[in-house]
């Protein structure tokens, strides 16, 4: 093993000098002697000097310390030994439950499957959440993004999807916590434990308080574990919360690596870094990876380079809106902004497609009429428009739903609504079958039968 020494430390970025004939390759892992720190080579600067990112705190490191080249990329445990465990970016256990005891380790930098190896499918993945199943259905083996600003419910929606899909879906799941709150990681662990699905989930955390190196690589660590399950012929779920923090970690180290910033101060390699991660999240002929990613939207601006770059890679986008959340309608999914490639009559069938499009039409028309109502009042509308507004308000309330993971806060039991019941409920409202019911009856219920029951009590 060749060894070098530290010549410069700037925050999380460390320059190491090696003999000219033994310069480590890019992405090689280096170990600092006498410290537990791992470094990853990012650039070769010439004259035997390499620029690296530290996977951990750089406190206590100083110039002149010896560094050893491991001659390989960072590798992490993969396989069934990882299930039910919490690990960090390097695959070390952080749940105080002893060593992982893995049979195999894999490098976190791998090539994406070739075009010939990839496989696509049109099978729908039922989530039990009405608004998602209706207007932006998920594909099995697809990629889904949950977009939203701060505090509109990305993590709660993510937890509900995990609960509904991971419990109904008997396969394996991998959860990568990228730069999110440690408290949420803890809540998630206990949620999985209480639901008795912990033995099917591998958890990888690189939280907010960790150095940028950890947050930049933790998504790749989780993905490497998911790829192993996929290559063994399983259908895997990969949850990433939050993909924006992955971009942000790249931004933090980009300037230290000596790159010029691009738009809004992001790294110039933003699209490439996103592509490297997203292209690996794909289904092959062996098995599938269905990925659900939360995407933080800075200042609620969907045109910000980070969410805008993420859009290009997704099959379905679920947009959470602050305006809808302010009406008290949860999940605060915007049915007019959310889209899915699966929303096609050839994939989901005519009835589902027509119902979804009609719901969107009614809500869009209501949005247009709001200005007239605000100025002139309801009385100035034609009879047809009055009827449309009444139905739109019922649809808007019927799009809300009590969640299982929020039972503790709301006090009302969670509801799982099958796709069949969802379509039946909305098409009934559109046809006018429930025009006689008060709109409050549709708020925070599961299926349409519950709305009818609720109306009797009002």
From Swiss-Prot:
* Highest rank taxon of the organism: Bacteria
The principal location of this protein is: membrane
Q: Which SMART domains match?
A: AAA
> What is any one of the record's Gene Ontology cellular component terms?
proton-transporting ATP synthase complex
What Pfam family does this protein match (any one)? ATP-synt_ab_N
Q: Do you know which InterPro entries this protein is assigned to?
A: AAA+_ATPase, ATP-synt_VA_C, ATP_synth_F1_bsu, ATPase_a/bsu_AS, ATPase_alpha/beta_chains, ATPase_F1/V1/A1_a/bsu_N, ATPase_F1/V1/A1_a/bsu_N_sf, ATPase_F1/V1/A1_a/bsu_nucl-bd
GO MF terms here are: ATP binding; ATP hydrolysis activity; proton-transporting ATP synthase activity, rotational mechanism
Q: If you read the UniProt record, what top EC class would you report for this enzyme, in one word?
A: translocase
Q: What is its EC number?
A: 7.1.2.2
Location in or out of the cell: Cell inner membrane
Q: What keywords were assigned to this record?
A: ATP synthesis, ATP-binding, Cell inner membrane, Cell membrane, CF(1), Hydrogen ion transport, Ion transport, Membrane, Nucleotide-binding, Translocase, Transport
Bilayer topology: Peripheral membrane protein
Task: Give me the reactions it catalyses.
Answer: ATP + H2O + 4 H(+)(in) = ADP + phosphate + 5 H(+)(out)
Residues binding ATP are 148-155
Known role: Produces ATP from ADP in the presence of a proton gradient across the membrane. The catalytic sites are hosted primarily by the beta subunits.
User: Subunit comment for this entry?
Assistant: F-type ATPases have 2 components, CF(1) - the catalytic core - and CF(0) - the membrane proton channel. CF(1) has five subunits: alpha(3), beta(3), gamma(1), delta(1), epsilon(1). CF(0) has three main subunits: a(1), b(2) and c(9-12). The alpha and beta chains form an alternating ring which encloses part of the gamma chain. CF(1) is attached to CF(0) by a central stalk formed by the gamma and epsilon chains, while a peripheral stalk is formed by the delta and b chains.
Q: Which family does it belong to?
A: Belongs to the ATPase alpha/beta chains family.
Record protein name field: ATP synthase subunit beta
């Amino acid at each position: 093993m060749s060894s070098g020494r530290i010549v410069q430390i700037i925050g999380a970025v460390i320059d190491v000098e090696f003999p000219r004939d033994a310069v480590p390759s890019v992405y090689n892992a280096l170990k600092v002697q006498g410290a537990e720190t791992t470094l990853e080579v990012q650039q070769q600067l010439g004259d035997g000097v390499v620029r690296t990112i530290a996977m951990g705190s750089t406190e206590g490191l100083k110039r002149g310390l010896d560094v050893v080249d491991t001659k390989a990329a960072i590798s992490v445990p993969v396989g069934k030994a990882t299930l039910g465990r919490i690990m960090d970016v390097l695959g070390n256990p952080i749940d105080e439950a002893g060593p992982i005891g893995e049979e195999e380790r894999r490098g976190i930098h791998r090539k994406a499957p070739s075009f010939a190896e990839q496989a696509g499918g049109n099978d729908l993945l039922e989530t039990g959440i009405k608004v998602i199943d209706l207007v932006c259905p998920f594909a099995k083996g697809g990629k889904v993004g949950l977009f939203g600003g701060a505090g509109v419910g990305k993590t709660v929606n993510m937890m509900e999807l995990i609960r509904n899909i991971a419990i109904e879906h008997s396969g394996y799941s991998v959860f990568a916590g990228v730069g999110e709150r440690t408290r949420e990681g803890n809540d998630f662990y206990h949620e999985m434990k209480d639901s008795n699905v912990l033995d099917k989930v591998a958890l990888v955390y690189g939280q907010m308080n960790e150095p940028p190196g950890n947050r930049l690589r933790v998504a790749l660590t989780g993905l490497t574990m998911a790829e192993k399950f996929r290559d063994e012929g399983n259908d895997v779920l990969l949850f990433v919360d939050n993909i924006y923090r992955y971009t942000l970690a790249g931004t933090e180290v980009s300037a230290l690596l000596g790159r010029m910033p691009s738009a809004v101060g992001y790294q110039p390699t933003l699209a490439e870094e996103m592509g490297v991660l997203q292209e690996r999240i794909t289904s092959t002929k062996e098995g599938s990876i269905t990925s659900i990613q939360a995407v933080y939207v800075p200042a609620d601006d969907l045109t910000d380079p980070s969410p805008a770059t993420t859009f290009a890679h997704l099959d379905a986008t679920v947009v959470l809106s602050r305006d809808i959340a302010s009406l008290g309608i949860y999940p605060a999914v915007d049915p007019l902004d959310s889209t899915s490639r699966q929303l096609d009559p050839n994939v989901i069938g005519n009835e589902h497609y027509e119902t979804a499009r009609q719901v969107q039409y009614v809500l869009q028309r209501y949005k247009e009429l709001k200005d007239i109502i605000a100025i002139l009042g309801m009385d100035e509308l034609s009879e047809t428009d009055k009827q449309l507004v009444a139905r739109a308000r019922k649809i808007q309330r019927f799009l809300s739903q009590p969640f299982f993971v929020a039972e503790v806060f709301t006090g009302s039991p969670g509801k799982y609504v099958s796709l069949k019941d969802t379509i039946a409920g909305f098409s009934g409202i559109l046809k006018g079958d429930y025009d006689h019911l008060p709109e409050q009856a549709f708020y925070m219920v599961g299926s349409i039968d519950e709305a009818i029951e609720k109306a009797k009590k009002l």
